[in-house]
């Protein structure tokens, strides 16, 4: 796609975000299967359903813009997925939950950056309804990041306590 205009560039990035959400929907299931702790599995399962809605919100954004869904690639998520899978394979089983949370945290940071940029550009285009849908996605991703951080801190504290015991 030629992205020589701001609207075309926005559509490209919106399409990339759509592919990001579709890929993360798959990845979250894999992370859930890799995780050991029930609270991590549950959080990943819940966010997976939110991720499904994120993709549908983006589809609705394209409809509001009167455009077909742009099928732009999202190489960042592809690379993060490869890295996460390789790291999980090489990690001692007792540390897998921590690695799963690291992967979740990294992807949430990326998603937050994507949505913040898209929202700014949607407002610049005067596409208020589009910005509102993207804001819903952003809010859920910020919450997912907080859940991952909190759980990661709990695991770290438990690990330190076990080491000091």
Model segments located where?
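Amphipathic alpha-helical hairpins
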Residues: 1-165
